[in-house]
Amino acid sequence: MPLWIVKMWHSQLGIDKTEKILAGFKQEKKTYVRCNTAKAPVEEIKRILSQENVSVADVEGIPYALEIKDYDYIAGLKSFRDGLYQIQDISSMTAGYMTGFKAGDTVIDVCAAPGGKSVNAAISVGTDGKVYSRDVSDYKAGLMKKIYQG
């Protein structure tokens, strides 16, 4: 961490908060991915990740979520570039899973950017359902359209 930032935090937040922030940077961050089950079953995605020498673990309670580690650069993985999964925070996946969306449902996501929850909903509702994704920012909505429509 650049010294000037540490000094700024120290002067604005005090030593205790600054130390907590710095300790947070040292903690190992977990990476969670949401499997794109429209492209492949979870077990196949796990097998492919293992072939890419990525360590994979199931996430209890969310059947399409995996924790991955032991990779250098996620965009360097063919499985990622092929769209077999998307990085998504576990809290977002939990929220999506707990809604219980099922085939044929209609979903409105009013705080949609960057789109992970909407994609999760789209996979859950399938081709018989509909997902309407909105965001307060036209810029963010445009990014989602560009990312997900090509």
Q: Where in this protein do the model-derived segments appear?
A:
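S-adenosylmethionine
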Residues: 1-150
